[in-house]
Amino acid sequence: MIKHNLVSDLRRLFIDFFVKNGHQFFPSSQLVIKDDPSLLFTNAGMVQFKQRFTSVDDRSINTAVSSQKCLRVGGKHNDLENVGHTNRHHTFFEMLGNFSFGSYFKERAIELAWDFVTKELALDKKRLYITVYHDDQDAFNLWKKISSFSDDKIIKIKTNDNFWSMGNVGPCGPCSEIFYDYGESVKGGLPGTPEEDGARFTEIWNLVFMEYNRTEEGELSVLPRKCIDTGMGLERIAAVMQGVHDNYDINLFKALIAMSKKESGNSSCEIAHRVIADHVRSAAFLIAEGLTPGNEGRDYILRRIIRRAARYVYMLKYTDSLMYKIFPVLIDETSNAYMADYYPELFKAKDLIISILKTEEENFKDTLVRALPLLEKELTYLSTGDVLSGDIIFRLYDTYGFPVDITLDIIKERGIRFDEKGFYDNMEQQKTRSRLSHLIKSTEQLNGKIWEDIRQNYNNTRFVGYDNFQVQSKILSMVMNNDRNVTVANVGDKVSILMDITPFYAEAGGQQADTGLLSVVRRDGKDLFGSSNIADVTNTKNIFDGLYIHECIVKSGSLIIGDIVSAEINSHRRKDLCANHSATHLLHYILRMEIDNNIMQKGSLVGNDKLRFDFSYNMALTEKQIKLIENRMCDLIRQNHPVETNICNLQNAMDNGAIALFTEKYDNHEVRVVNIGNSKELCCGTHVKYTGEIGCFKIISESSIACGIRRIEAVTGQYAIDYFRQQEKVLYQVAESVKSPVEDVLVQIDKINRENQELKQKLWAAYFDIIDMQGVNIEKIGNINFLHGTLSSVPIDVVRKFIMKRLVKDMIMLFSNVVNHNKIYVVGVGNSLHSKVKAADFVKIIGCVVKSKGGGNAQLAQISTEYIAEVDVIQHIKDELVSIFNA
């Protein structure tokens, strides 16, 4: 019998019950599925066990229990627009589940479920109802036997709500649900009735009996190993146990909502607080797993969640950032919303979560301030049932960056409809403009219309560059100066060339394009030996997903449409590109293995001279970590692992552990997998044949490029050797400069620094003497000591240090100083006076006199001006002091 009904208590009770009944406990898998680009986020408890359901041979684990983090935003399962408006929808939720992989089936699954809800949770049986699939008489009979329910409490459902499948083909089976009756005070009817959408009867547990396999023809056959997959929403069962029929009234959400109301100072607009509470939790978990707000894929989902919450913060008329102030409730042990005990990643990433929530919300406030008044103006002309023009919605999105889903939220609240056709017509026009713009950009002002016309006449270029550095190819089309078709290109002409076959890799996946030569070997059916008709290939682009455009400069002779050319890439450059690309894969692998398994690639650039790798991580790498990465890389290079590529379907690649970037688009049927030791990635780039060809590896920089995103730059092969030589050269130059042997350079530099510091101290003391000699005037104004003086050619940092050293709590100091024809005023105010006046206040007063602006804080501030005419600034300050302190 349960003694406590907090969310954390219920989670522990569920897990303990099934462990006691022979199930192996599995921690929650991540929301971000790194090896499955077909799924945005984990959206059900069974996701981490996918392969166990489909593998007949894997019998290492027969049963499991978990409490799984889930997110339903985007894709098939998208609850975002309902969040805050209903009692039970969330973006993030936890799914309690028990699973059997051929161990037990219907009867045992039903027994366990019934024992848990009636004995462990002690729910009133009178309030429970059961649904089964209408054809599943077996489940009906078992429920009747185990629960002793009458027929009217076991409801047969004919719709697919009670038949579950993993997809259009594959494992599937009937399911059975347990419903809880909140009583007549809540509206709603029994499952299967017209009133079933009400809140009275709430599904609390779904038991899936996976016993069939569906073929592509839709036929069902019995699985050789029958499985059980169950799911109980933790928030839903918490609502039942806490005697509320609204998930937002459970202890966890009450704590989050209370903090939202407290920090915002606004207790009205309940929907806003519910949305904010839900979205803070979702965003925190996503950031903890390495996501950062962006414009593509999963990163955009995170941005979308934060921005949607920011809009509701704006509705509360709260002008500061709010979300980052609510998040700490989730990691506060004394809070009812404490989740960091079961999910320690929240505490580990707390600084990053706070930083990203604050920054992203602040940035979006500007968009809200600009766009919302325009939307509000348009809505004043509309009434309930009217339609908001798609042109307006698109303009808000395109011009102001105002998310469409937020616009839809706003108009939905007012009963105004969405002009879907008008909006998507605008989007299609924009896509067309964008596609042409991309063509123009990708081929240096290339006329996109010309290439669209060419595209209609030719098939995709056949790329053979993985295995060939040189091939013979036919020139099919040429565009001169990016604006006209030509049949001949002569010396000096810049021409974009389409050929039927090419070894030139076009820029993709972060790897730069190949360069090389085209030499005419046959013209008009005649072989040309020692041809002088040559063009340099300076760049290669892949447009229309398959048309390779070679940007060339004719160096000698001419090129004519129909010519057969020897197309040869710069092999030395290609080998450098291959080395850097393979090293990039290994770097990604090492970062995840040695630094943090949550690290995700955020971008890369593979050049011939260096590589650049951007990744999610919330702190700078230490010197020790960088050394570890370099050592592991050198180990992998010395081990000379073969680099293997294979083509397979996407699902097979994922099942074998290949990593895919969610921002990339992959063919559902065929993908290219690059295997380097234990590193497996989907990749279309070029690579070395053995890791030994990388030669050597050196990280040359590690830095932050955005909140939560780090960047590593590195060199390999000859470029790494050149880097070492350059560093060695600098070291010898430094040794010569400080007159020391190389091995003693650090000792000598340390000695020089100490001597320099001693001299600096003497210099500061001398400057202080100069200030004293140039004249420091002391006046008493009431109880205040006012020190002021006029200086000449004293460094400004010396003046600031002088003030900070001499300033006492009841003193105000003001010095003017002429430096490089500018007059600079520096003001200091003692701590005890800050309640009445601050240094920055005096700078504003001076600014009004000398027509300039300055800045500072309560204790120290300064202002610079070219206005050097004699103005009695001192007298203005004295008058102000008399006024402030009533002297």
Swiss-Prot record:
Chief localization: cytoplasm
GO molecular function: alanine-tRNA ligase activity; aminoacyl-tRNA deacylase activity; ATP binding; tRNA binding; zinc ion binding
A single GO cellular-component term on record: cytosol
SMART domains: tRNA_SAD
Gene3D superfamilies membership: 2.40.30.130, 3.10.310.40, 3.30.54.20, Bira Bifunctional Protein, Domain 2, Threonyl-trna Synthetase, Chain A, domain 2
Annotated compartments: Cytoplasm
GO biological process, one term: alanyl-tRNA aminoacylation
Note on domains (UniProt): Consists of three domains; the N-terminal catalytic domain, the editing domain and the C-terminal C-Ala domain. The editing domain removes incorrectly charged amino acids, while the C-Ala domain, along with tRNA(Ala), serves as a bridge to cooperatively bring together the editing and aminoacylation centers thus stimulating deacylation of misacylated tRNAs.
Record's keyword terms, sorted: Aminoacyl-tRNA synthetase, ATP-binding, Cytoplasm, Ligase, Metal-binding, Nucleotide-binding, Protein biosynthesis, RNA-binding, tRNA-binding, Zinc
Needed co-factor(s): Zn(2+)
Cofactor note: Binds 1 zinc ion per subunit.
SUPFAM superfamilies from the UniProt entry: Class II aaRS and biotin synthetases, Putative anticodon-binding domain of alanyl-tRNA synthetase (AlaRS), ThrRS/AlaRS common domain, Translation proteins
Binding site for Zn(2+): 581, 585, 683, 687
Catalytic reaction list: tRNA(Ala) + L-alanine + ATP = L-alanyl-tRNA(Ala) + AMP + diphosphate
Identification of the protein by name: Alanine--tRNA ligase
Domain of life, source organism: Bacteria
Family as reported in the entry's similarity comment: Belongs to the class-II aminoacyl-tRNA synthetase family.
CDD domains per UniProt: AlaRS_core (cd00673)
PROSITE patterns given in the database record: AA_TRNA_LIGASE_II_ALA
Phylogenetic lineage: Bacteria, Pseudomonadati, Pseudomonadota, Alphaproteobacteria, Rickettsiales
Cited function: Catalyzes the attachment of alanine to tRNA(Ala) in a two-step reaction: alanine is first activated by ATP to form Ala-AMP and then transferred to the acceptor end of tRNA(Ala). Also edits incorrectly charged Ser-tRNA(Ala) and Gly-tRNA(Ala) via its editing domain.
InterPro entries registered for this protein in UniProt: aa-tRNA-synth_II/BPL/LPL (IPR045864), Ala-tRNA-lgiase_IIc (IPR002318), Ala-tRNA-ligase_IIc_anticod-bd (IPR018162), Ala-tRNA-synth_IIc_core (IPR018165), Ala-tRNA-synth_IIc_N (IPR018164), Ala-tRNA_ligase (IPR050058), Ala_tRNA_ligase_euk/bac (IPR023033), Thr/Ala-tRNA-synth_IIc_edit (IPR018163)
Gene name of this polypeptide: alaS
Keyword Transcription listed: no
Entry keyword annotation includes Amino-acid biosynthesis: no
EC number: 6.1.1.7
